[in-house]
Every structure is written in C-alpha cells, then in structure tokens.
Amino acid sequence: MEGETVAYKFEILKGQDNLFYWRFRASNGEVMCSSDGYTAKASAKNAIESIQSNAPRAMIEDKI
C-alpha cells in the first residue's frame, strides 16, 4: 500500500485508561465514529472485522 491513498480507515489506539479503542476516519481526517473501550486489543480488532463483514448488509433504521 505504499504510495497508495486510502480513502477511509480504521485506527486502533490505546487510551490513558489502558483500554483499546477503534475509530473510523474519512479521507479528510474526520472521525466518523468510534468505539467504547475494550480490555484486549484483539477484541477491538474483532469488532472492526465484524463491522467490515456485516455493515454492507445493515439496514438503516430511521427512528425520527
């Protein structure tokens, strides 16, 4: 991926509380969504993989 522009990306970070978080960034750097804390990095990664797998089939539920 070197030299390639990635439009959107997930990031995994460790907070000052020692929990792991993910966030989803747009190509302009804006954080579009982020997670609650996970005690294990693998759990944060599993959540990302679940979103990547299931989001294309997710329905939009308008509650307004």
Regions found by a protein language model. Name each.
Residues 6-9, 56-58:
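Generic structural motif recognizing short loop/turn segments at the entrances and edges of beta-strands
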Residues 8-38, 43-51:
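A structural feature that tracks compact, well-ordered secondary-structure segments
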Residues 50-61:
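Short arginine-rich
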Residues 1-5:
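Short, Lys/Arg-enriched N-terminal segments with co-localized hydrophobic residues
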